[in-house]
Structures are given as C-alpha cells and as structure tokens.
C-alpha cells in the first residue's frame, strides 16, 4: 500500500495547479484509431499526428487534429490548399468516418453538431444524440453514459459444446469544468472459447486480457472486468492520468515494449508534449505470477517506464524506451520515481537486482499511402558474444518491422498491413520470478513470450460506410521447453538460471512448434456503434509429436465494445 499512499500525496500536491482543459482517452480498439491512422498516413506531414506511438489517444488532442484536417479537405474541395500548399483527399467512406468520429467525441467538437442529433430519440430522453444513451453537455459539465453488450455464439468443428461470449456492462465518461476528466467501464462476462483458448487459460491460470475469474458451467469462465481513471493537467503541456486500465506503446499490431494483452493494472502516467517532443512517464503496480489458493492477499511488484518520442522531420518520428520491473515486499523503489534518468544507472547504483529493458522505435510516413515502423527491444546483450555467434543465452533482444499501405493499389479504403516479430530465447525473463516482464500470469509485451518468429498480415476494407471486411493471418514458429522440463527460454515466467547451459540457444531452440491462425470477419454497423459480426477462423497448431486443428464459425452482436479475438 505504500505506493498508493505515495501517489495519493503526489496527486494532492499537483491538483492545486490544475488550470487547463483536460480530456478522457479513446478506448483501445475503438474504430477511431484506424481512421486517424489513415489520416496520418494520407496527410503525411502532420507532425501532431506523428505522436501516435503512445496509446490510448487523448480525445481532445485528436479531435483538434481531425477538425483541422477536415478543414484542409474542405478547402481543397474549393481548390484552396493549406498554408503549406497541401491538399488532403478523402473518400466518401472517409467523410462518413469523419462525421462518426467527431460525433463520438462531441465534447471537444467546435464546429457544427446538427448531424449528431437523433431523429427518433427513445422515450424522448434516451439517445438524444446518435452515439450516446445519455448525454449531458453543459458549459462546465459533460457526461456520456452508454451500455456495453457483446453476444456471440458459434461452433468448433469436432467439438460438441457451444462456443459463446455473453458480455453486459456500462461505461461512462465525463468532464468537470473542463479541468478534470473521468472514465469508468464495468462488464460482467461468461465465456467459453474454442479448445485452444481453454487450454491457454489452464496454462496461464488466467483469462487473457482480464484478471480474476471463476469456472462457469462446463469448461467456461466467469469474470468481472472493471476499469477507470481520472485525468487532469499539471501544466499547459503536462497531462496526468491515474487509474486502473491498460496502455500500449508501439505502432504495430503487437508491441515488444508494452502491449494491452494482459490484465489491467494500477498506474500513474505523466505525459509531456511540447515542440517536437513527447515524453511519457508510466509507474505501475503489478501482480507477479501466482497459484489460485482461495481468498488471500496477492503479492505486489512494480514497474517504471519512460518513452521519449521526437519528430525528426515532418514525416519521421523516432522514440527511445526504457523500463524496469522490480519486486520489493510492499515497497516501491523510490529512486525509480525520478522521471528524467536512465534506469540502468539507478539499477546499478542499488545493486542490479532488477529487470531493466531499453528500446528504440521509429515510424515513417511516405508518399501519402505508406507507413514503415519498427521496434528494437534490448533486455540484455554483449556485442562480443553476438560477434562470436555461440548462441549465448543472455543475448536477449527482440525486433519488430512492419508496413502499412492505405488505399492499396488505388482501391479506396482498402488498407493492408504486414508485420514481423522476432524475440530471442530468455528475453523478458529474470533470475527473480518476481521481476520477470509479466503481470497477473500474463506477458506484458508479446503474448507468445519469447523464443519465436512471427509474421502477421492484415487486410481492412470498408467498401461502404457501414460495411467492414477484415482478414488476418498470423504464422509463427517457436521453440518450446522439452517434455522433461528443460528450459529453452520461451517461458518468461521461469527463473532463467534453470537453463541447462549458457550457449547454443538460437531462435527456435527446443521443441519445434508451428502455428497458422487465420481469421475473416464481415461486420455491418446497424446503428452508431452497434455491429453484427460474422467470423470464420482456422487455426492449425503443430508441435513435435502432436497437433491441434481448429475450425471455428461465430455470429453475434456487439455494442460499444471491441470484438474479442483469439489471436494466439
């Protein structure tokens, strides 16, 4: 509890300085991310949108950019370029998405809002605006309340049980005097996934993406997911967020730094954006791996992360990352609260007991249609050992390279993405299992852990305003531990001192596993944020001596929530 008391005192100290407008954040997976990503690539030289590596996005900030780009587009329709001589081209579907995006973030829209009003409200008081069940938009107070629903059912070939997900909940966001923002989301869930997802839950002793759960009927799970935060400003360029939720660092489908694949966690985040720089400090309270033993207080561990993003040019953004995972018995290491210092130096000063990582990322927008991106993550390495090429176990690193192509081959609203991820054995692991790069029995970065090579291909196509076609192929190879328990470095939860030797570890060492995971989905937006989904998935997994093939078809509806996927 010491970290909670410390953060509370810090918040009390900062609050008196709150002076400028504050915003909530766009939920991860919101359709607005894909749209803003398209705008960034198509406009190419908008340096404000280039700061998109850190997610979730600040609503106020991205609405400002969307309205600015919308004005450029409308000036271009009249033959007038912007001050830099640029024209922005939007398709009819983009125009629809622009209206939808602004409508879903109405509290920050400065232009006309006539199109946001519902023609047929329910009971004359509900859905007065198209996206929100209840909306209050006054001078010093904003509140939006919406239901959450996800119901799908399907069949897996060769499996008699019904595959299903039943999610019900509510979310609310708001502002007080445009100085304090708040958000909360609560869902109750009952789920039975395909057999490989059921096995994943057994292996992890956790439901991917969520926390505590209970068995439900035959092979199902029951879990409650609650998130929430408050947000405000410490100064004109400094935003502060405190709450229980997730974060993501990267431009790809995966992240080798920090993903949103694990459970939510308590965090304090400071984000400073000024001139060509964006600097984020993230302090987190995490849960180490554990065995379910009934009602008992779980141990704590902690993390501190920095990310500095710089616009080197109007089209090129680079970033530096560092993070530290550490365990103290109910005690935060206060030296890691320093927001402007290299953690590796601090770790060495206090005796090197912790798990430090560093990284580099880049993103380049090219030719108004292409984006190239990547990450290099360094856990530990020695250049001499890399040159020796002996497979030294502690050369622990990961690399990501990817590309996005919008309006591919001249087809409007056809967007393609390809991504490669490679992570060496023993990466993210540590000699102290408390200090490994995990949270609540789940990896903090890539869901596969380590010792793998992965290739991802994604197609997104919106042929008409309310129709969405998505396809995704994931193929990976991984070296798993032997059946006799020999540690080949794929499992970040294991003490890395349990390895059999120091040399001879290459990517894929161990039992050879191969996996193909393909999915196609057609969605229709019945009304704002209400979707009907039809999904087909084929997964073929093979490891030495056994294989598991999954053919899955599901159909369902969802409201104000991202579709739950089984992408591992």
Predicted regions and their residues:
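Outer-membrane beta-barrel channel domains
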Residues: 27-30, 45-53, 58-60, 65-317, ...
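Bacterial Sec-dependent N-terminal signal peptides
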Residues: 1-24
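Short, charged, low-hydrophobicity "junction" segments
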Residues: 8-16, 39, 114-122, 250, ...
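Active-site-adjacent bridging/hinge elements
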Residues: 36-39, 238-245, 373, 377, ...
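Generic structural marker for isolated residues within well-ordered, non-membrane alpha-helices
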Residues: 36, 227, 456
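Exposed, low-structure sequence patches enriched in small/polar residues
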Residues: 223, 316-324, 329-568
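Short N-terminal segments immediately surrounding and downstream of signal-peptide cleavage
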Residues: 23-40
């Amino acid at each position: 509890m010491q970290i909670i008391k410390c953060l509370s005192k810090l918040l009390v100290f900062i609050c008196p300085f709150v002076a400028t407008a504050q915003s909530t954040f766009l939920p991860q997976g919101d359709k607005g991310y894909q749209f803003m990503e398209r705008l960034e690539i198509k406009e190419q030289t908008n340096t404000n949108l280039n700061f998109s590596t850190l997610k979730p996005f600040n609503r106020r900030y991205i609405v400002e950019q969307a309205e600015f780009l919308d004005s450029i587009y409308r000036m271009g329709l009249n033959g007038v370029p912007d001050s830099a001589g640029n024209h922005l081209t939007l398709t009819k579907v983009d125009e629809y998405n622009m209206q939808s995006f602004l409508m879903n973030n109405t509290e920050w829209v400065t232009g006309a809002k006539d199109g946001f009003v519902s023609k047929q409200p329910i009971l004359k008081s509900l859905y007065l605006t198209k996206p929100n069940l209840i909306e209050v938009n006054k001078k010093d107070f904003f509140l939006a309340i919406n239901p959450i629903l996800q119901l799908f059912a399907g069949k897996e070939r060769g499996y008699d049980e019904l595959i299903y997900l039943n999610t019900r909940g509510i979310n609310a966001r708001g502002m007080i005097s445009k100085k304090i923002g708040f958000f909360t989301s609560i869902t109750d869930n009952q789920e039975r996934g395909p057999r490989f997802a059921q096995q994943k839950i057994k292996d992890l002793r956790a439901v991917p993406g969520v926390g505590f759960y209970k068995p439900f009927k035959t092979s199902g799970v029951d879990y409650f997911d609650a998130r929430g935060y408050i947000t405000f400003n410490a100064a004109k360029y400094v935003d502060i967020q405190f709450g229980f939720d997730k974060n993501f660092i990267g431009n790809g489908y995966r992240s080798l730094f920090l993903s949103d694949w694990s459970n939510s966690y308590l965090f304090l985040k400071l984000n400073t954006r000024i001139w060509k720089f964006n600097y984020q400090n993230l302090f987190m309270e995490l849960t180490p791996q554990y065995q379910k033993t009934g009602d008992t207080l779980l141990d704590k561990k902690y993390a501190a992360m920095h990310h500095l993003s710089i616009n080197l040019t109007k089209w090129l953004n680079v970033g530096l990352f560092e993070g530290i995972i550490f365990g103290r018995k109910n005690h935060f290491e206060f030296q890691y609260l320093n927001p402007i210092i290299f953690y590796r130096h601090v770790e060495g000063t206090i005796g090197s007991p912790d798990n430090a990582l560093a990284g580099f990322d880049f993103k380049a927008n090219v030719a108004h249609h292409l984006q190239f991106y990547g990450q290099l993550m360094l856990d530990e390495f020695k250049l001499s050992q890399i040159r020796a090429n002996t497979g030294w176990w502690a050369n622990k690193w990961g690399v990501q390279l990817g590309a996005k192509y919008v309006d591919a081959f001249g087809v409007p609203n056809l967007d393609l993405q390809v991504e490669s991820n490679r992570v060496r054995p023993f990466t993210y692991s540590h000699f102290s299992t408390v200090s490994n790069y995990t949270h609540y029995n789940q990896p903090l970065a890539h869901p596969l852990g380590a010792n793998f090579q992965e290739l991802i291909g994604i197609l997104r196509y919106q042929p008409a305003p309310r129709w969405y076609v998505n396809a995704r192929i994931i193929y990976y190879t991984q070296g798993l531990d032997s059946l006799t328990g020999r540690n080949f470095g794929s499992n970040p939860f294991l003490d890395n001192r349990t390895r059999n030797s120091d040399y001879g570890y290459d990517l894929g060492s161990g039992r050879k596993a191969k996996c193909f995971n393909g999915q196609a989905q057609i969605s229709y937006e019945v009304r704002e944020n209400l979707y009907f989904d039809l999904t087909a998935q084929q997964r073929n997994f093979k490891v030495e001596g056994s294989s598991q093939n999954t053919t899955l078809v599901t159909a369902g509806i969802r409201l104000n929530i991202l579709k739950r996927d089984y992408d591992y």
